[in-house]
């Protein structure tokens, strides 16, 4: 690129500011979208200046193409990629403008070249920094000699434009794939051999019957029942032997208890029996003249209520039956309990 004029430098500064405002919100941007934004911004920058009123359309279009070419030059490193880094693009654009327009003082918003001026109506001036507080005045030193002004640096040569990347060679057409060989027919599966017949199971030995060993019949039947075998007919009714020793012992014990009970009954529970002898009757004769110091006279003719007693009555009372021999009238029926000799028998009737 040739050295730009002051008008082009003013357009470049305005272009850089508007591009920064348009894409600075993103970190990565597609290259195609970056070029579209550059065309729109170039059109706005050129149209909003006074150039549109003083130059022909051909010159205005060339200025637009100049700004677009600058955007392409900045993004040359991303020409083969689909996206680009926004911060890198803005940094390269500012470096390009500094290198191209270092000989011009582009600090004002409006730059004029004769009667032609370039202004940015949409960009406000940068805020001025606040003035620093004035230091206290120091004692004035002696005036030093004024230094000589430094010589202006020689203008830097314009950087050579980067060489355009060589066009990529057209890709060679991919060779046609060789036709695949026809697949070989799958071999027919071999016939499966006939399955061998399963061997016949060995005959099961029949179980022995429990009645073959009568001495262990009950044990054999119990073992079969524990294993769930109830097919033996000899185990349906198991005849139990009679335990004669047990029943004989029970019978002997019963006989002994009966004999012992009989003697106990006769000894303690049966009524005593007395023989009707003359000696017992003579002992029961008492003298009527016995004096008890109370002048009580026991009359032998007193009736004690024993008249009319039959043999059957004595049997009911469990008393001994008197013999056939006549009993003297003075005899008295003995009491159930034995009475010692010489003691009088009181009458059952009240004493008069």
From Swiss-Prot:
GO cellular component entries: viral capsid
Compositional bias segments (type: Pro residues): 146-204
Major subcellular site: virion
Region annotated Hydrophobic, chain positions: 244-264
Localization (cell): Virion
Compositional bias (Basic residues): 129-145
Keywords for the protein's UniProt record, in alphabetical order: Capsid protein, Late protein, Virion
Disordered: annotated span: 122-214
General function of this protein: One of the minor capsid proteins that constitute a network internal to the major capsid proteins and outside the lipid membrane. The minor capsid protein P14 does not serve a cross-linking function between neighboring capsomers, it may play a role in the viral capsid assembly.
Subunit structure as annotated in this protein's UniProt entry: Interacts with the major capsid protein.
Entry's free-text remark on domains: The hydrophobic region might anchor the protein in the underlying inner membrane.
The protein's name: Minor capsid protein P14
Native source organism of the sequence: Paramecium bursaria Chlorella virus 1 (PBCV-1)
């Amino acid at each position: 690129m040739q050295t730009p004029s002051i008008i082009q430098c003013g357009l470049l500064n305005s272009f850089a500011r508007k591009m920064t405002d348009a894409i600075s919100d993103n970190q990565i941007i597609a290259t195609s979208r970056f070029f579209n934004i550059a065309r729109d911004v170039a059109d706005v920058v050129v149209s909003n200046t006074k150039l549109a009123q003083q130059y022909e359309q051909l010159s205005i279009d060339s200025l637009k193409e100049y700004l677009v070419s600058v955007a392409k030059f900045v993004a040359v490193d991303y020409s083969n990629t689909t996206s680009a880094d926004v911060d890198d693009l803005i940094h390269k654009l500012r470096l390009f403008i500094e290198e191209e327009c270092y000989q011009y003082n582009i600090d004002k918003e409006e730059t004029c070249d004769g009667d032609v001026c370039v202004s940015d109506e949409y960009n406000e001036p940068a805020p001025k920094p606040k003035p620093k507080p004035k230091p206290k005045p120091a004692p004035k030193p002696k005036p030093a000699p004024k230094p000589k002004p430094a010589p202006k640096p020689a203008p830097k040569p314009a950087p050579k434009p980067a060489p355009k990347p060589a066009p990529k060679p057209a890709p060679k057409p991919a060779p046609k794939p060789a036709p695949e060989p026809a697949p070989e027919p799958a071999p027919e599966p071999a016939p499966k051999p006939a399955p061998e017949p399963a061997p016949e199971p060995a005959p099961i030995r029949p179980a022995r019957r429990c009645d073959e060993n009568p001495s262990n019949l009950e044990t054999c039947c119990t073992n079969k029942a524990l294993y769930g075998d109830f097919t033996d007919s000899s185990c349906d009714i198991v005849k139990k032997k009679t335990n004669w020793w047990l029943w004989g012992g029970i019978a002997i014990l019963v006989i002994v208890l009966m004999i012992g009970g009989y003697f106990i009954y006769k000894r303690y529970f049966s009524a005593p029996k007395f023989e009707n002898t003359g000696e017992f009757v003579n002992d029961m004769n008492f003298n009527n003249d016995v004096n008890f110091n109370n002048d009580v006279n026991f009359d032998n003719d007193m009736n004690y209520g024993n008249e009319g007693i039959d043999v059957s009555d004595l049997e009911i009372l469990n008393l001994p039956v008197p013999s056939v021999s006549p009993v003297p009238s003075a005899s008295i029926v003995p009491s159930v309990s034995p009475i010692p000799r010489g003691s009088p028998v009181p009458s059952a009737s009240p004493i008069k």
